[in-house]
Structure formats: C-alpha cells, structure tokens
Amino acid sequence: MAGDTGANPLFLGWVKEWWDTAREHNTKGAPTYKKAYNSLKACPLTFQHPSELQVLNGFGPTISQRLTDRLKQYCEENGLPMPKHPKRKRTLELESALAAAGAVQDEQPPPPKRARTARPYVPKLNSGAYALLMALSELGPKEFMDKTTLIAKAQPYSEHSFTVPTMANKSYTAWDSMKTLEQKELVWLRGLPSKRYSLTDEGWEVVKRMKEAQNLVDGVAGSANTSRNAIASGSGTSNPNRSENVNPNRQDSGVKRESRYTPLDLKPFVTTTATPERPLQPKPHTANSEYSIIIDSDDEDPKYDEEDRKPIIRDTTNRDYIDLVADGDSVPDESNLPHFTPIRLAPGSFTVELVLDTREVQAKNNRDHIQEELSKLGVRPVMRSLELGDVLWIAKCKQPGWLNRLGAEGDEVVLDYIVERKRLDDLIGSIKDGRFREQKYRLKRSGMKNVVYIIENYNIDMDIRRQYQDAMDTAMASIQVVNGYFLKKTDTIAESIRYLAAVTYMLKEIYESKPLFVIPTQVLTAKNYLPLVKHLREKEPSRGYYISYPAFASLVSKSEMMTLKDVFIKMLMCIRRLSGEKAIEIQKVWKTPYQLVKAFEACGSDENGKKKQKVLVMSMLSHLVDRRNVDKGLSERIADVWGFL
C-alpha cells in the first residue's frame, strides 16, 4: 500500500488490493474495482467513513460495505476507534465540495470542431442492419413482417446470430441493429404489443445504395429467395457467401470441387466461388492459396428437411472401449512390430462425418449453438463425448457390420485430423493450471498426423490480456514451432464454425474418392501403436493407415494414456490452491509419490519432525518466484495430505 498515494491512502490501498485479485482471477468485478480505484485516486477530498465514498463514480453499497468491514477489522487490530457513520448533512457537504472541485474549468473555450460532411448511410456487409434491410426488401411497399419471420429471413444474410449473443459475456445480438434502423427512420414499426416491420422510403433508398455499392443491376425484391449460406475461411476474418443449400449425403449434391488436394494435407485456406448470375451476392473472400472448394448450384433448389438438420447422436461412450486394446509388451525395435493384412474400404463405401464433442458449447445457456450452425451449413455433426480434442473426423461405413466381419469394431474409422478449440480466456486458464501442456502431450501420444489448434478471440479485460500476452504468444508459438501443429486464429465463434464446415467439405474431397486402409484391431496394443504408425508412414508415405473409432477411443482413454508422472501431478492438483505449475515443480523435485512420502518420513514424527514436514515443500521450492512459488500455508496443506502430522 505504500505506493498508493492520494487523500485516502488506506481506502485506496484496499481497493487496489481487490482490483489486483480480481485481475489475477479474471473475474467480472475487475473493471468495477478499476473504476473505483481511479475515481478515489483522483479525488482531492478526505473521507472519514467508507459510506461517504458513494458520492464517487464506481462506488456503490457493496464496495462501501466491504470497505467498512475492512476498516472495522483494521481499527480492532490497531486499537483505533471506529469512525461513526456520517449524517446526511456531511454527505451533502461532500457532494457540494465535489461539485465545486469539478466546476473549475479552463476559461479558454475549446477550438471549434471542423464541420463534417455526412455520408449516406450504408450498413456493413453481413452485419445485422444489412441482413434486416435485405429481409425487409422482400416485402411490397405496403406489406409488413413480424419479428419471428423477419429474424428467420434475415439470419442467412448475417454472420452474427439474431438470438445468441456474439460474446458470451455480452448481451448484444444482431437484432440490436434494429434500434439503429429505427433511429435513422429506415424502418416503420406498426402494432403494439405485436410489432410488425416494413421499410420506409429512406429504407428503400439505402437498399438501392447497397445494390449500387455491390455493382449489381438486378432488382432488390425476391433476391433473398435465391441465396444460401456458403462456407468461407481464410487467414483473417472472412465473409460468408450466399448460394443454395447443398446436402452432402446426396449422390448428386451440386458440389463441384477441384481435385487438386494432396492426400493428408490440410491447407489453411479454403475459399468459395459463387455463380455470377446470382443477384445481391456479397463478393467472395479470396485467400492466397492454390487450393479451393467451388460450391455451385444445381438447376433445382435442394432444401434440408428438419430431420436432416438434426445432429446425429451416438449413445456409446468412450468408456465402453477402455479395455478393447491391450497394454501389450514394449517394442524395442521394428522387428518386433506385427505383420498384418490391412482392411480395405473401397471408394464410395463410406462417408466422411464430423464428430463434435458434446461439451463443446458456445455458452452454458445455449449448448446446441455450434451443431445447429453446422447443420445450417450442410454439415450434420455426430455428437459424442470425446476423450481427446473437441472435433475430429471419421469415415462411416454405409454397410453396417462391414468392419466387424473384416477384423475391426464398429462402423467408423478415425481419420488423421483432430481439432482443439480454445477461446483466449480458456487458453489463459489452461496455461495457468497446466492443462495446456497436458493436452499437447496427449495429442502427441494419440498418433494423429494433423492437429489443428483453433484460437478464438474473446473479450477479456485489457489488464488481464496485457498480463498474460507474453504467455499466450509463447503458447501459440510453441504450438507451431515445437509441436508442429497448425494454428488457426478466428475472431468469432461464427468464423470457427465456418472453418470447421470448410474443412469437412475438403476432407470429403480428399477421402471419399480413394480407398482407406485400416489396421485390424487385434494386432494393436498400447505399446506398439505409435511405433507401428511411425514405421508405416516412413515405409509407405503415400498411403495412409487408420484404425477404428473404438480402437482409437481405447488408446486415447485418459486412464490408459497417463504415465506415472501424469498421475502424480493430478494427485497433487487435488489439493486446494495447488495449481498445475506448482504441481509440475514439485514433481521435478520428487519424481514419484513414493519419493515424496519418503521425504516426509525422513523428517521424523516427533514435534521437531512435524515442524520440518510443514515447511519441507516450501524450503525445497524457495528459489522459485511468482505463481510457481509455494507459500507456508500451502506447504502445510501438502504436509497434511502427504506427511505424517
């Protein structure tokens, strides 16, 4: 608190302490404490009681009461009298003093602002306002549309949801753009409480300018009926194109693709080309890449029915497959690897499907957003609890029982692509508790050739961002340089979903036109899997070898994949306040649980020995700083669990 200056250093120091704690834990109260701290620091008046602080910006009953409790504790500890609660007269005097202090202004008038020429309003492409105007342009001059119908018509034109907030901790949706349109008098509102909407004359003028801005000559009315969502993805933010719905399960789906993909090679850029005759289409986003997916339209307009839009649900869990693959013996060299005849799946006998983890959600109150948006883009996800990763792709046999007859389980084969999606706040949390390192380690042990990390932008406190920026940059660099994984950065969850859909279409192009070779499950063990896969890739780099989904689930099951080191670290992290970073440092000193128990045992069980046990971990890690350091309280807690107190 010594560094806190101002007229109220005691109160200022406590608020600063709470602000620092809120920033450290990335809580929502951090901006509130920051506002209160800056307000109190700038105030020249001295306050006697915390309740008087409510005349300042940022101070409410909660902070004032917390300061009162802290002041009471401070007075009791130091033998000081507790200040009395101020009277109303004192509060009025403070308000007058603050008003007088804020009324002092520079007598010199500010320089006159230069007049700006107002530009004609044209909403941003694919914004909420753009989508609403496009949907309303389908109406005739005297027709109106209710909110439910309007949202359904407008959603295909917008890259943001009209019902779900763009950011999990914000309330803004694309529908909030309606307020802007009403303020600019571009939309008529009729009827209460059942509201109906229509374009004003000015609204029609804006639609006309939108048309001119896109260099299109076709009329506005009815244009949305010939449009659909297409998939777009690039190195930066991309805009969705519009075309007709394409059902990937149809034999003649209208999907034209350039067959220039190299096998097992995931390229970061996937672009979309729209037909030139389609009216009111946004210009497609093109990426600097020779790889592209061209999605064109049929003469007809195929539509998904409601059943096609629903995700595929699988009830079988990975726990059912834990004992499927045996542990086996170690493999000292290639001569100990098994010889086998691979199972061959002919082209056309399977379809490529996206598997989405059931825990992968946008927000707790909207758990189905990702699968619903994928379904709108023509990708029916298979919903399943995944032990590893958030998204992966499988080849699903069209003929049930085919794999069983040939020596593998189930009807699904895991392809060599897996995705780990992390928002910035989740990335920071996983770095702090050690999950980030553990996940990368388990991905490496999975044998997957193509690992993609999607790092999704998120609105976090700027102080938290600055505090962990170096850690985030280091983590993202290690993903690419150290581990050799592909890193995809997106700005919104909508962009992440479009990217996943684009990858799905690309993998369909890569795999569905060639045979798949599957390793029989009976030759696999947990010890020979990685050496076998490595040997096959070196021996036949042009041919991929895959395993069934049940075998993969058994191999990556957390209970089978964890080493003694992993188990020990997880055991340590069960202790309250013991983070992943601290657990890793403890494991570096005592390699196994046995060594830690023996270290406590060596301290002795008498009174002097118990004192040594309480400070054992703290003394051994005293050279560490910051978050890796173990204080006395945590050291005693560890001794309570592992020692002989």
From Swiss-Prot:
Entry's Gene Ontology BP terms: DNA catabolic process; double-strand break repair via break-induced replication; mitotic DNA replication checkpoint signaling; mitotic intra-S DNA damage checkpoint signaling; replication fork processing; resolution of meiotic recombination intermediates
Annotated Acidic residues bias: 296-305
Subcellular location: Nucleus
Keyword check for Nucleus: yes
Cellular component terms (Gene Ontology): Holliday junction resolvase complex; nucleus
Molecular function GO labels: 3'-flap endonuclease activity; crossover junction DNA endonuclease activity; DNA binding; metal ion binding
Source taxon at top rank: Eukaryota
Keyword terms: DNA damage, DNA recombination, DNA repair, Endonuclease, Hydrolase, Magnesium, Meiosis, Metal-binding, Nuclease, Nucleus
Top EC class for this record: hydrolase
Principal location: nucleus
Pfam families reported for this sequence: ERCC4, MUS81-like_WH
InterPro entries: DNA_pol_lamdba_lyase_dom_sf, EME1/EME2_C, ERCC4_domain, Mus81, Restrct_endonuc-II-like, WH-like_DNA-bd_sf, WH_MUS81, XPF_nuclease_Mus81
Span of domain ERCC4: 353-459
Its EC number(s): 3.1.22.-
SUPFAM superfamilies: DNA polymerase beta, N-terminal domain-like, Restriction endonuclease-like
SMART domains xrefs: ERCC4
Biased composition (Polar residues): 223-252
Cofactor: Mg(2+)
Family indicated by similarity: Belongs to the XPF family.
Function in brief: Interacts with eme-1 to form a DNA structure-specific endonuclease with substrate preference for branched DNA structures with a 5'-end at the branch nick. Typical substrates include 3'-flap structures, D-loops, replication forks and nicked Holliday junctions. May be required in mitosis for the processing of stalled or collapsed replication fork intermediates. May be required in meiosis for the repair of meiosis-specific double strand breaks subsequent to single-end invasion (SEI).
Protein name: Crossover junction endonuclease mus-81
Source organism of the structure: Neurospora crassa (strain ATCC 24698 / 74-OR23-1A / CBS 708.71 / DSM 1257 / FGSC 987)
Organism lineage: Eukaryota, Fungi, Dikarya, Ascomycota, Pezizomycotina
